[in-house]
Amino acid sequence: MSKIPLTIRGAEKLREELHRLKHEDRPRVIQAIAEAREHGDLKENAEYHAAREQQSFIEGRIQEIEGKLSNAQIIDPAAVQAAPKIVFGATVALEDTDTEETVTYQIVGEDEADIKQHLISVNSPIARALIGKEEGDEAVVQAPGGERTYEIVEVRYE
């Protein structure tokens, strides 16, 4: 299995979620299952079945996070020595050549991506178009809404 790139912040968020699942959510669901069992017949006990389903989801998510963390390549963007080239972890300011609108994105791992926070996945069309480019270059992005051209205004690692 190949390594999954994660920023330090992304790995920490996964660790926090894992801790919450193991130490808060899992015990709560186990208690709910025990209480539902006390209500008698399990075949028609909706509370029991709902709690078991939630337990299954929690256990699956725990395994998923543990797998991601064990296969993670944790990268500190501030320590990346790739400048001026754009690589994973870069924060990039772009200007749309049509609208002259400027937007800034950080290229992060798949699990960290959040467009509202300007965090884009390393596998996104924008990131794929940017990787390997430098300040002053133009990047053509094949987006679902059509082709967009951006000028790379600034590249930084923080």
UniProtKB/Swiss-Prot annotation:
Coiled coil region boundaries: 53-73
Homology family: Belongs to the GreA/GreB family.
Alphabetical GO biological process terms: DNA-templated transcription elongation; regulation of DNA-templated transcription elongation
Alphabetical list of InterPro entries matching this protein: GreA/GreB_C_sf (IPR036953), TF_GreA/GreB_CS (IPR018151), Tscrpt_elong_fac_GreA (IPR006359), Tscrpt_elong_fac_GreA/B (IPR028624), Tscrpt_elong_fac_GreA/B_C (IPR001437), Tscrpt_elong_fac_GreA/B_fam (IPR023459), Tscrpt_elong_fac_GreA/B_N (IPR022691), Tscrpt_elong_fac_GreA/B_N_sf (IPR036805)
Function: Necessary for efficient RNA polymerase transcription elongation past template-encoded arresting sites. The arresting sites in DNA have the property of trapping a certain fraction of elongating RNA polymerases that pass through, resulting in locked ternary complexes. Cleavage of the nascent transcript by cleavage factors such as GreA or GreB allows the resumption of elongation from the new 3'terminus. GreA releases sequences of 2 to 3 nucleotides.
Superkingdom of the organism of origin: Bacteria
The protein, known as: Transcription elongation factor GreA
Gene field: greA
Keywords: Coiled coil, DNA-binding, Transcription, Transcription regulation
